[in-house]
């Protein structure tokens, strides 16, 4: 709607767009590609307008890139660019000043002896030099000889190569100064005047008509007298108020004297000014350059020093007072305040580089002539305006003290009117000191607030008083104040407010007042304790924090040592357990299968059977055989034999058919069956493993395959079946042959033939055997009772039993 009409009927900004638009509209009523291009260009031109980019409506990408590049400029780059501009402007100003301005043959700008930053006040220095209270910047000579002629002195002063003494270059030739005529006097007077725009209308007439000092001085220009002739006599109220408000500024401007140029006269007493100045050159003891003898003199030791060295001497940077020294610039009214602020930064005045006396200052005795710039308000120069100083005139009798030629015997005070101190050319030292003090106060306040907030938060979070010993007496006072005023802690309970209260320390949080007048009255007076106490408290807190950290590190080291000791004890305990296990294993195999355990005499056939079983197996005893099986004491031998007898009778009674086991399963499967049952007690196992008797031997030969299915808990009827089965085995001799045939027949079975052995030997032979062959069965029984944890060992033991049975057959 309105926007589309604006697009259609807004005139383009450029003339080319206007021509294309007119041509396209006159050629055809329809839309043309030229008109489309015109609309696109006009929209782009409207989008790139700077007034729209301010509102954020549009803007070109090039301008955005330029803006980003401008924003990327860092502070250091801006400072470097500013310093470069200042240096270029200073070089240009130095060239102009050296070409156009001078004071008695010297200059108002430095000559490049020092290349550092010129941080002295150039306006004040220029004013002091024009007033002849400070020596100008003379051009220094690297070399000097008293035998130099006038043209050699001129060449050295102008920076030219020094010619031979008997040869005068053309540029150094000079003629005697001509005498001035009346026309020359008038022209010189006009030359000495200030420009007409900067002085009053009656200045020229006064200067030309009168030559007395009283009438020749310029009248000060006041704001009322500076009004135009067409202005009304009575001004409006607004102008009157404006003049009153600017009267102070106007008085300051009018108090500044006007600079005027004295007539150009390159000769003094018939000599060129350079030759007159440098004929008695003096060396500056600091920069070792030769200058005219009109140098500054120190007020204390009367040593010469050039102005370029003098303006480089300044106060040291603000620093804390050393050895309890007081503020040197403090007045008597600030004595009490200084006691309260004894740790503030101080700025010591510069000391003399020769005698190291403080309040360094210089005096200056100008030469007996005047050249170059002067101030028009100087009353001693006004009588000579009509008759300028000639080459033969001198001001020694008019305004310069007579030169006695000897040094001053006494030092001058720093407050002497003729003394110029270093603070005079650097009047901003007080502002620098105030800025440094404010910066140090901010840093100290920030550090104090951080420490206090950290301690307050730690004490609030922990809730114990052990961490609060680092707060010192200030923390004790704060805790006491908070305990006395519980309502104040509810109002200012946050650590930030407490830190702020600690920082100001004007009043405690409990002394807050609701009225603004009482609050302002409490904040106005400073606190009683000084800043030194605050610094001491801060140092105390920092020392306590260091002690706390040291104690924490010592505690951590002790805990680490205890942990290492515990680990070492555990390691030693493990090693002792391993050694004990190894000792028990070696003791088990050495005492196992021996007759000494049961005090039973051994037999030759028993040894033969044991050796044959060991040779059949073909391997040593495994380290895991009989693991964690304790040997029974000899006192428990009777109980062990009784238990083994019960187990043997039980196994023979429960499973009296060995053929079922022969054809049904292997010995390993029979060993695995008791795992589903509840194992007996370990003491019972130890008794079984250590038991060795004739009954267990008989059980080995007859009921090996039935041992896997016995029930250890069914021991109530064991004695009846035990003796009955034993009597049947011993009494029946006819079954011996059948049993031998049966064992011979089953020995060819692959898996169960070792387990299905019977009582082939004669009963008296079986009863006479020792209990040594019962040990492998006992070991197998132990492994069987421990839920078949080692099936390979059980299988090996079964093989040993089979071999023992075969050897028994062979013996029979």
Swiss-Prot record:
Signal peptide: none annotated. It is found in: Cytoplasm. Coiled coil: none annotated. InterPro entries: Sip5/DA2 (IPR039301). Its main location: cytoplasm. Disulfide bonds: none annotated. It comes from the Eukaryota. Residues 34-44, 61-97, 172-187, 317-326, 554-582, 737-747, 783-795 have a biased composition (Basic and acidic residues). Residues 14-33, 200-211, 386-402, 632-651, 689-701, 748-763 have a biased composition (Low complexity). Residues 1-97, 160-187, 200-232, 317-339, 385-412, 508-532, 554-718, 732-812 are annotated as: Disordered. Keywords: Cytoplasm. GO terms for cellular component: cytoplasm. Residues 796-812 have a biased composition (Polar residues). Belongs to the SIP5 family. PANTHER family: PROTEIN SIP5. May negatively regulate the snf1 kinase. This is Protein sip5. The gene is sip5.
